[in-house]
């Protein structure tokens, strides 16, 4: 087994017992793949499929003029290069986007002959399309955003009922709904009287037969579509019907049924059963004589014409009178509809009878009246409206998904055409579609078939970034189309080009609106790598076209059987969004139709294969799926007599031969965040939910520390999140410093004609969206060999390429003087001293100089009425120095604003300009450090409007950036030269010279000779071998090209820096100051474990006072044991024990290293740990002695262990490891009180738990106010920290003071401390003078009350 660079350094022992069938997939694929398919950027225009952007263009173009003489056709689109890269966009506050150009063809036809008269082709600029970064995010206006995927109801047809809630009788009313991808909804529904109604777009209901009439069917045709006929014969005064025994089953016999010999088969009043049916068939009965009463209330199936020409219409109810008419009219035979009360209800016939419309025209008018109330209906308007509703591809689109679901639900073949034409035809409804839906609805009402479960994942699909952007793009294009159509008629006469016709602004506006302000375009949660990944893998049922929090019921939010392996049953927010926002399971992916799929191994005849098949919830119906941990022998046969399986959403046991599939992994059920919780299987689900949510709030600590007890998913998350630097190609580390890594690439991975050098620039101390610090640290050394995919540098919260959200803490579960009451946490001062829970937060503060009506604001160090001391940290331009340590109230950027007292005349302006009387007419509006903030300035950026002169500081920053870039490029070229020189020496070594350079013809080129020459001289040598001479020429050409490319890069960078910045209107200059704030842990900060065990730090004790063991090792944290039993998250106890074993083993390894034991002894001990305690076996023999020593050195702090979710370490294994580490098998330790040295009464559970510091820091929440801003109307202090507000003294607090009888305190609260304007000014003066006298006046809110009463017309004094 081959280990990667980081794995060699620190192998994580895995306790998993199940074989790894497939690796966890790339975790961001749902975002990246979706947008890639949308853009199809890498493909040539000819090879582009009809999806994404291409489909959007194809669906709107060609655009024809109203006359049909001019048309615009779409040819192809191309995306340019973005102007700035991702980092520059974040810095400048711009959008990372590429310009899009579309080739459009204008065709003009001759008016008379309609032949093509003119064709013009032109590229049209269509605005910018935001590009996705490598990590699945978008940079919009300088901030990283994520487009969350939406889980919405799939288009198609759905049958449902109201569960008896609509009508007071409790009768179940059935309904059907056809939902298109875009267009009008069509609903059919029953009412309490069993008539069928139709609604279009949820408007007023009409009888369903109105729509059938509008489709062109008459009464007879409608009845034929829904009912079978029964012929009735009139023979010698009695009626006979054809006997179909099967139809009679279940009915009550209304008369005796006899055979041909008169023997009674069924007596009157008895129910006809299967035995009776068999007897009738045996007796050979073909006709049945029926009394007249039997035919009463039956329905005629067609128009019946009597002898005298009178017509009895179809759908007439038979009665005595009608029967007499038929007999007199000489009708010998007629058809009635086959209906009964059991499974052939007469619903459609009854509806048709209630329908007052007589023909198609009337039906269309009825529909028009509902859709356009108040407008006078005309025949054409009604016809057009109805056709446009469901039969026009412009207005209605079922989409391939909708058509597939529709056909599948109605039991038709569901292959969907892929070409544009068939997609248009299948996208609209046909007459048969509407009739089949109605027929199925009636069948369900008759008791055949089931209603749909709308929460089934086969009826909900995922709309990802690409699809949502495509929809927005289409919206923009349709707006363009409207405008273009009107202009096209001009194009025929005015000789216009495509550029003149198309205005791309609506497209750009639609895209901008979507990315900037859509509910699903969210500010990325960038607390740590896990929160980024989780945010990108989120699926939301909210958003446009989705649910709203208020309307979503319990069923939608609940866990559904189809969530298994597709959506995580654990990870969802607490609060109003619970169950509406979910996370994808680890192995889940969306298929082409947008349905979530999960992988399974195929099982054939009880034998498990390694073939993996992805199944959606629709395809999973009917399969029998065994669990991942089912017992299997070495040949893959299921060994149990009855296997525990899932079938039709139920957990049952079945014999192995019936099993069709098997889970690929035990982690398949849960999401990424939940799969990072060790011993998840021992935690209550509610606590696991809190645990997975709180891991996302963990703040990256100063030094990341890998978890001793992990799950094995840590490396996957760190790699896929994109925060680490990963080697694109293998090679040797040529150069490394804190901000750059250079790799000389392996020969076999190089592309012909390149120097084979990869340069990786690291991100240093950058601000994240949540103000945490993003910083990358190198983990490779000079000369190290790395392979493709190896981790070169750690990002925030990663340690050796593994996710490391918190710190391993030595915890004791015991009480300590009430300091861990109610989940409080007692910390040791050692944690503070070692900076283990210290984090760096970076704040961005902006100062904007605007052009005001009174003149321009100015950024300057010349500020009126400010002392020298306050300006000591500013430079001549008035901007703070980098490295300055600042506290609350310090000036960061000096800015003065013109005062608005007097409007100056031009003469006065001139005098002021000459004599510089600044102080009089400007006020200080400098940027100061906000209250409660203290930190170090780490960066300053100055942006100046294009056309304005840059100040000294801006020029200095620009120069520094250019110098740094020039240095980078020089070093880059130097590395290329070095690499080229080595290659040249390698090529020339041992060759014969043909002269050139300092060599003579026939010289043998030795290594000593060559290594003494410079590259220039080397390249002048002409070797005898022509192939090598050719190679040298190639290298020379390459270096020239590289040099030119570097010069070009530098010129481009210089141009970018020299041009002014695009600032919003009225803004002249923006200065951004970045403050780094160091936050140590302190009482009031929130901490948590990974099992939902959260608490607030109550006290930080000196190390010497903490409880310690017999060896004098103090604990870091004391937790309350009462926090475990009632919460049922026992996983934390198992983690603590296993953590103790991991640390104990690390201590033993450290002891061995100190005693300088032999490598062989080390190998043996490591072998015991990795290969003798169960779990996955490690190939330690493949490591060299040096690598074993390096590995042992990295294991000193503890041996990292992985206990995968649902496949983790067993109790016996934990005990074995504890024993191997020479620790008691109970996991409990005798502790002593640090203050008295006395032993505690009983042994205490002590071990190592991974604790996180959450982004709920007391520094951000603590806030105090004496005086400040007041509300305009009520004059009461504002609320909240952001407004520098006060604490609300509400109604209940007033009651408390009343209860104590504290009258003066109460008066003070309600007047001078609140809204008594004069009183508070007076008391402020008094306190300043040292006189604490209070003189309360009238509160302003009382004045407001009197004003409101007066506004009602009641005078009050």
UniProtKB/Swiss-Prot annotation:
State the protein's name: DNA-directed RNA polymerase subunit beta
Cite the Gene3D superfamilies for this sequence: 2.40.50.100, 2.40.50.150, 3.90.1100.10, DNA-directed RNA polymerase, beta subunit, external 1 domain (2.30.150.10), DNA-directed RNA polymerase, subunit 2, domain 6 (2.40.270.10), RNA polymerase alpha subunit dimerisation domain (3.90.1800.10), RNA polymerase Rpb2, domain 2 (3.90.1110.10)
Q: Which reaction does it catalyse?
A: RNA(n) + a ribonucleoside 5'-triphosphate = RNA(n+1) + diphosphate
The Gene Ontology CC terms held by the record are: DNA-directed RNA polymerase complex
Class in the EC hierarchy, top level: transferase
What Pfam families does this protein's entry cite? RNA_pol_Rpb2_1, RNA_pol_Rpb2_2, RNA_pol_Rpb2_3, RNA_pol_Rpb2_45, RNA_pol_Rpb2_6, RNA_pol_Rpb2_7
The question of whether Nucleotide-binding is a record keyword is answered with: no
> Gene of origin?
rpoB
Role description: DNA-dependent RNA polymerase catalyzes the transcription of DNA into RNA using the four ribonucleoside triphosphates as substrates.
Its GO biological process terms?
Answer: DNA-templated transcription
Give UniProt keywords alphabetically.
DNA-directed RNA polymerase, Nucleotidyltransferase, Transcription, Transferase
Family stated for the protein in its record: Belongs to the RNA polymerase beta chain family.
**Would you say which domain of life the source belongs to?**
Bacteria
Give the E.C. number(s).
2.7.7.6
Question: Does the UniProt entry include the keyword Transcription?
Answer: yes
- Assembly mode: The RNAP catalytic core consists of 2 alpha, 1 beta, 1 beta' and 1 omega subunit. When a sigma factor is associated with the core the holoenzyme is formed, which can initiate transcription.
Q: Name one GO molecular function term.
A: ribonucleoside binding
User: What InterPro entries does this protein's entry cite?
Assistant: DNA-dir_RNA_pol_bsu_ext_1_sf, DNA-dir_RNA_pol_bsu_external_1, DNA-dir_RNA_pol_su2, DNA-dir_RNAP_su2_dom, DNA-dir_RNAP_su2_hyb_sf, RNA_pol_bsu_bac, RNA_pol_bsu_CS, RNA_pol_bsu_protrusion
